[in-house]
Amino acid sequence: MQNIKAENSERFMKKNYRCRIIFSSLSLILLFIACWIYVSNRSTDMVIYDWLSIDVNNQLFCFLRNTEIEFPDWVLYNLPDALWLLSFLFMNEAIWGKDNRKYIFVAVVTIFALSIEILQMFTLFPGTGDMLDIISYVIVLIIYLINNFLFYCYEKFSKN
Protein backbone atom coordinates (compact mmCIF):
# COMPACT_ATOMS: atom_id res chain seq x y z
CA MET A 1 0.00 0.00 0.00
CA GLN A 2 2.80 2.39 0.93
CA ASN A 3 4.54 1.56 -2.35
CA ILE A 4 1.45 2.51 -4.40
CA LYS A 5 1.13 5.86 -2.59
CA ALA A 6 4.79 6.66 -3.22
CA GLU A 7 4.44 5.69 -6.89
CA ASN A 8 1.31 7.84 -7.34
CA SER A 9 2.97 10.75 -5.54
CA GLU A 10 6.03 10.50 -7.79
CA ARG A 11 3.85 10.37 -10.93
CA PHE A 12 1.88 13.41 -9.68
CA MET A 13 5.09 15.38 -9.06
CA LYS A 14 6.40 14.63 -12.58
CA LYS A 15 3.08 15.59 -14.17
CA ASN A 16 2.83 18.71 -12.02
CA TYR A 17 6.39 19.69 -12.96
CA ARG A 18 5.62 19.27 -16.69
CA CYS A 19 2.50 21.44 -16.35
CA ARG A 20 4.49 24.15 -14.59
CA ILE A 21 7.15 24.09 -17.32
CA ILE A 22 4.49 24.30 -20.05
CA PHE A 23 2.62 27.19 -18.40
CA SER A 24 5.77 29.16 -17.60
CA SER A 25 7.11 28.62 -21.15
CA LEU A 26 3.81 29.76 -22.67
CA SER A 27 3.85 32.77 -20.37
CA LEU A 28 7.32 33.83 -21.50
CA ILE A 29 6.50 33.28 -25.18
CA LEU A 30 3.32 35.37 -24.90
CA LEU A 31 5.21 38.09 -23.03
CA PHE A 32 7.89 38.19 -25.73
CA ILE A 33 5.30 38.39 -28.54
CA ALA A 34 3.39 41.16 -26.75
CA CYS A 35 6.57 43.16 -26.14
CA TRP A 36 7.71 42.69 -29.73
CA ILE A 37 4.36 43.90 -31.13
CA TYR A 38 4.39 46.84 -28.73
CA VAL A 39 8.00 47.92 -29.30
CA SER A 40 8.04 47.35 -33.05
CA ASN A 41 4.90 49.30 -33.88
CA ARG A 42 4.22 51.97 -31.27
CA SER A 43 5.43 55.56 -31.14
CA THR A 44 8.82 56.13 -29.48
CA ASP A 45 7.54 59.12 -27.50
CA MET A 46 5.29 57.01 -25.26
CA VAL A 47 5.51 57.48 -21.49
CA ILE A 48 6.30 53.81 -20.91
CA TYR A 49 9.75 54.26 -22.43
CA ASP A 50 10.51 57.02 -19.91
CA TRP A 51 9.15 54.97 -17.00
CA LEU A 52 11.34 52.01 -17.95
CA SER A 53 14.32 54.23 -18.92
CA ILE A 54 14.53 52.64 -22.36
CA ASP A 55 16.89 54.28 -24.83
CA VAL A 56 14.89 54.40 -28.07
CA ASN A 57 18.13 54.82 -30.04
CA ASN A 58 19.52 51.53 -28.71
CA GLN A 59 20.58 49.07 -31.46
CA LEU A 60 18.34 46.27 -30.19
CA PHE A 61 15.39 48.63 -29.96
CA CYS A 62 16.01 49.90 -33.51
CA PHE A 63 16.38 46.31 -34.77
CA LEU A 64 13.03 45.33 -33.24
CA ARG A 65 11.37 48.36 -34.83
CA ASN A 66 12.66 47.49 -38.32
CA THR A 67 9.67 45.46 -39.40
CA GLU A 68 7.90 45.76 -42.70
CA ILE A 69 4.89 43.73 -41.59
CA GLU A 70 1.62 45.63 -41.47
CA PHE A 71 -0.76 44.47 -38.78
CA PRO A 72 -4.44 45.31 -38.30
CA ASP A 73 -5.08 47.94 -35.63
CA TRP A 74 -6.49 45.45 -33.11
CA VAL A 75 -3.22 43.48 -33.27
CA LEU A 76 -1.17 46.63 -32.65
CA TYR A 77 -3.30 48.22 -29.96
CA ASN A 78 -5.35 45.51 -28.23
CA LEU A 79 -3.55 42.20 -28.64
CA PRO A 80 -0.43 43.15 -26.61
CA ASP A 81 -2.57 44.02 -23.57
CA ALA A 82 -4.49 40.76 -23.86
CA LEU A 83 -1.24 38.79 -24.25
CA TRP A 84 0.28 40.50 -21.19
CA LEU A 85 -2.72 39.53 -19.09
CA LEU A 86 -2.72 35.96 -20.43
CA SER A 87 1.03 35.77 -19.82
CA PHE A 88 0.48 36.75 -16.19
CA LEU A 89 -2.36 34.26 -15.79
CA PHE A 90 -0.24 31.42 -17.21
CA MET A 91 2.71 32.30 -14.97
CA ASN A 92 0.32 32.47 -12.04
CA GLU A 93 -0.85 28.99 -13.03
CA ALA A 94 2.74 27.76 -13.19
CA ILE A 95 3.43 29.07 -9.70
CA TRP A 96 0.21 28.12 -7.90
CA GLY A 97 -0.95 25.06 -9.85
CA LYS A 98 -4.06 23.55 -8.28
CA ASP A 99 -4.02 25.85 -5.25
CA ASN A 100 -7.25 27.87 -5.28
CA ARG A 101 -5.47 30.88 -3.79
CA LYS A 102 -4.31 31.60 -7.35
CA TYR A 103 -7.76 33.02 -8.07
CA ILE A 104 -7.08 35.88 -5.65
CA PHE A 105 -4.21 37.00 -7.89
CA VAL A 106 -6.27 36.40 -11.02
CA ALA A 107 -9.04 38.63 -9.65
CA VAL A 108 -6.70 41.37 -8.40
CA VAL A 109 -4.70 41.64 -11.63
CA THR A 110 -7.77 41.46 -13.88
CA ILE A 111 -9.61 44.10 -11.83
CA PHE A 112 -6.48 46.27 -11.88
CA ALA A 113 -6.19 46.00 -15.69
CA LEU A 114 -9.89 46.77 -16.17
CA SER A 115 -9.68 49.69 -13.72
CA ILE A 116 -6.76 51.25 -15.57
CA GLU A 117 -8.71 51.11 -18.84
CA ILE A 118 -11.80 52.63 -17.24
CA LEU A 119 -9.74 55.38 -15.57
CA GLN A 120 -8.12 56.11 -18.96
CA MET A 121 -11.56 56.44 -20.55
CA PHE A 122 -12.39 59.20 -18.06
CA THR A 123 -8.89 60.75 -18.44
CA LEU A 124 -8.12 60.02 -14.78
CA PHE A 125 -5.04 57.99 -15.75
CA PRO A 126 -2.58 58.65 -18.59
CA GLY A 127 -3.24 56.67 -21.75
CA THR A 128 -6.06 55.94 -24.13
CA GLY A 129 -8.99 54.05 -22.66
CA ASP A 130 -10.28 51.56 -25.18
CA MET A 131 -13.40 49.41 -25.00
CA LEU A 132 -11.66 46.76 -27.14
CA ASP A 133 -9.00 46.43 -24.43
CA ILE A 134 -11.73 45.80 -21.87
CA ILE A 135 -13.35 43.23 -24.16
CA SER A 136 -9.98 41.56 -24.76
CA TYR A 137 -9.34 41.32 -20.99
CA VAL A 138 -12.73 39.71 -20.47
CA ILE A 139 -12.12 37.27 -23.34
CA VAL A 140 -8.70 36.35 -21.90
CA LEU A 141 -10.22 35.79 -18.46
CA ILE A 142 -12.96 33.58 -19.93
CA ILE A 143 -10.40 31.57 -21.94
CA TYR A 144 -8.26 31.13 -18.83
CA LEU A 145 -11.18 30.02 -16.64
CA ILE A 146 -12.53 27.61 -19.28
CA ASN A 147 -9.03 26.20 -19.78
CA ASN A 148 -8.69 25.69 -16.01
CA PHE A 149 -12.08 24.06 -15.72
CA LEU A 150 -11.54 21.72 -18.67
CA PHE A 151 -7.96 20.89 -17.70
CA TYR A 152 -8.81 19.96 -14.13
CA CYS A 153 -12.01 18.13 -15.12
CA TYR A 154 -10.04 16.10 -17.66
CA GLU A 155 -7.38 15.37 -15.06
CA LYS A 156 -9.99 14.36 -12.47
CA PHE A 157 -11.91 12.04 -14.81
CA SER A 158 -8.81 10.55 -16.45
CA LYS A 159 -7.80 9.13 -13.05
CA ASN A 160 -10.95 6.97 -12.98
Give residue ranges: language-model regions:
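Bulky hydrophobic segments
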Residues: 2-160
